[in-house]
């Protein structure tokens, strides 16, 4: 018999009754029922109940064990009485009568319990992450992640892609976030960078003549933390293809992602219709470039109904160029109480509030419009709004005005909140959409032209488009949204040096700087580069959706906290003076 176990803690069943076995694992919990000990022994695979009475040679030793001790049990498999069978356990038909026990690893008093799902402060959970990971839900999440990665690999191989690894330490490049820099000991004063993504390398793989590439790639970005984003590092399914257009990438990716969600979605419906929605339409209809299509609410422009109306605030606003009024329909939201609650929500998001109209049955039995706006703009305009929005008795509509960029984000959050409160957002399904036609450029906080997304995307219209207004240029850039999250981002690449130089010039990068920062890729493009494109899917976020978790740290084995600290390993840490001397660095105190 093996030194530690003859079976795992999920293998034994009625067919093993009478056999002598050896099990090893953690003490999940112990119960003393008046001279009979019941011990749940847990390993990676499951739980087996162990019993010992006063006649058992192991009884005295088992009385000393505590939760999370690692022990080895020798014993005999017994059938449980029919009334004691536990259908929730794979081993619920049997129990092991202990005849011997050895302690393999004792445990100190636990800072957090493993048994049960009691909520503990995140600081405690991350400091003792190895204990946290023993808890059932988190253990399941990590196994889900492992299985998702394995499935992705199999699906990519099956689709004719080849897996290649790219460098983990490389040169710094501007890709939308801060780099993690690594000082060079051999080249004092110079720094490497951890890659924000394998972007340049995967494009070079295409230039090198390989056709379909993928990688489960680690990416490193010094970012501000969010619930759906790690502040330091993450993993992505990285994809690149040669001789493709946008629709070719979509056709290659959809079977992989759709199949993955069907495999691990716990029976939730996975919609096969993935619409293409222009970025501008997504912002107009949903107030977000990652819309949750489970919510049927679509916002609309209703400026014409307020221009010259009796509602002076909106009428005066519309006299300014670039302003508009948008409506958020709220089917079944036609009560003053609900409307006031949503108005308060808008105020909590930093806006003065939202105007609203709701439709109800009047004293004469006919439908009438009510609310502050209805009184100001009159029945003809409110009726025109109702008809445009397709609303009726018992419904409501909310209104926001100004320049779209000042209220779109809040409008999107209000749409989400309205859908949730009214029960309009469909549960138990995954709805996908490709967001396309992203603007190539945007203005930064200082009013300067900058890239809005990936700087390596091909501008729609090529060089000719770059000769006009940069803010009107669209890129062959696309995202895949699912249930309100961005799962994939990608683009058709700019593989022509002259167009690349012009694109970067508009964003303030002279040719010399582009040559310096991207010299390897520019050089490669001068030796015959194929048209190519691809994308990257965030694995952490995909697993978060499949696990139905609200926080990405619940699907990462050893995550950082909100302050980008590893509480278990003590990172970041101070270097020794010797390390600093070797690197010819010194720490400058904060002002």
Swiss-Prot record:
It comes from the Bacteria. GO terms for biological process: aspartyl-tRNA aminoacylation. The keyword Zinc does not apply. Its main location: cytoplasm. Keywords: Aminoacyl-tRNA synthetase, ATP-binding, Cytoplasm, Ligase, Nucleotide-binding, Protein biosynthesis. Gene3D superfamilies: Bira Bifunctional Protein, Domain 2 (3.30.930.10), GAD-like domain (3.30.1360.30), Nucleic acid-binding proteins (2.40.50.140). Coiled coil: none annotated. One of its GO terms (molecular function) is nucleic acid binding. SUPFAM superfamilies: Class II aaRS and biotin synthetases, GAD domain-like, Nucleic acid-binding proteins. Disulfide bonds: none annotated. It is found in: Cytoplasm. GO terms for cellular component: cytoplasm. ATP binds at residues 221-223, 486, 538-541. PROSITE patterns: AA_TRNA_LIGASE_II. It catalyses: tRNA(Asx) + L-aspartate + ATP = L-aspartyl-tRNA(Asx) + AMP + diphosphate. The record marks 33 as: Important for tRNA non-discrimination. Belongs to the class-II aminoacyl-tRNA synthetase family. Type 1 subfamily. Homodimer. This is Aspartate--tRNA(Asp/Asn) ligase. It comes from Cereibacter sphaeroides (strain ATCC 17023 / DSM 158 / JCM 6121 / CCUG 31486 / LMG 2827 / NBRC 12203 / NCIMB 8253 / ATH 2.4.1.) (Rhodobacter sphaeroides). The lineage of its organism: Bacteria, Pseudomonadati, Pseudomonadota, Alphaproteobacteria, Rhodobacterales. The gene is aspS.
């Amino acid at each position: 018999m093996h030194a530690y176990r003859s079976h795992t803690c999920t293998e034994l069943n009625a067919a093993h009754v009478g056999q002598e076995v050896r099990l090893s694992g953690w003490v999940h919990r112990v119960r003393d029922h008046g001279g009979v000990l019941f011990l749940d022994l847990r390993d990676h695979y499951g739980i087996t109940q162990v019993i010992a009475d006063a006649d058992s040679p192991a009884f005295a030793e088992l009385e000393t064990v505590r939760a999370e001790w690692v022990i080895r049990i020798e014993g005999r498999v017994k059938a449980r009485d029919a009334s004691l069978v536990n259908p929730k356990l794979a081993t619920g038909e049997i129990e092991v009568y202990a005849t011997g026990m050895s302690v393999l690893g004792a445990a100190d008093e636990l800072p957090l319990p493993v048994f049960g799902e009691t909520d503990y402060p995140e600081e405690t959970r991350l400091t003792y992450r190895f204990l946290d990971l023993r808890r059932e839900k988190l253990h399941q999440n990590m196994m889900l992640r492992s299985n998702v990665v394995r499935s992705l690999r199999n699906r990519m191989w099956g689709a004719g892609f080849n897996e290649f690894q790219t460098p983990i330490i490389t040169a710094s490049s501007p890709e939308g976030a801060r780099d993690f820099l690594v000082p060079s000991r051999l080249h004092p004063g110079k720094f490497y960078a951890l890659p924000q993504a394998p972007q340049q390398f995967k494009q070079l793989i295409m230039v090198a003549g390989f056709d379909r590439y993928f990688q489960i790639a680690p990416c490193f970005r010094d970012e501000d933390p969010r619930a759906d984003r790690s502040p330091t590092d993450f993993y992505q399914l990285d994809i690149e293809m040669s001789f493709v257009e946008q629709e070719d990438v979509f056709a290659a990716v959809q079977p992989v992602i759709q199949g993955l969600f069907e495999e691990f979605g716990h029976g939730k419906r996975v919609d096969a219709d993935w619409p293409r929605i222009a970025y501008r339409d997504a912002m107009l209809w949903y107030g977000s470039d990652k819309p949750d299509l489970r919510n049927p609410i679509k916002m609309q422009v209703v400026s014409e109904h307020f221009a010259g109306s009796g509602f002076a605030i909106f009428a005066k606003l519309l006299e300014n160029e670039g302003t508009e009024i948008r409506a958020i329909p709220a089917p079944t939201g036609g009560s003053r109480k609900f409307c006031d609650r949503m108005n308060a929500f808008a105020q909590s998001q930093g806006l003065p509030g939202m105007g609203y109209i709701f439709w109800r049955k009047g004293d004469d039995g006919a439908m009438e419009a009510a609310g502050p706006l209805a009184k100001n703009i009159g029945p003809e305009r409110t009726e025109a709004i109702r008809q445009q929005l397709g609303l009726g008795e018992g419904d409501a509509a909310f209104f926001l005005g100004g320049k779209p960029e000042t209220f779109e984000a809040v409008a999107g959050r209000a749409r989400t909140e309205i859908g949730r409160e009214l029960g309009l957002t469909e549960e138990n399904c995954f709805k996908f959409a490709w967001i396309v036609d992203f603007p190539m450029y945007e203005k930064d906080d200082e009013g300067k032209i900058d890239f809005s997304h990936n700087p390596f995307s091909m501008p729609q219209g090529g060089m000719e488009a770059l000769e006009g207004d940069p803010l009107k240029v669209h890129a062959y850039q696309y995202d895949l949204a699912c249930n309100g999250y961005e799962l994939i981002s990608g683009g058709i690449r700019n593989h022509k040096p002259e167009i690349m130089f012009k694109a970067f010039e508009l964003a303030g990068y002279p040719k010399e700087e582009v040559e310096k920062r991207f010299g390897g890729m520019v050089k490669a493009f001068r030796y015959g580069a194929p048209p190519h494109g691809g994308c990257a899917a965030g694995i952490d976020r995909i697993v978060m959706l499949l696990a139905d978790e609200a926080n990405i740290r619940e699907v990462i084995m050893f995550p950082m906290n909100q302050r980008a600290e590893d509480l278990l390993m003590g990172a970041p840490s101070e270097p020794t003076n010797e390390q600093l001397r070797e690197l010819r660095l010194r720490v400058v105190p904060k002002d």
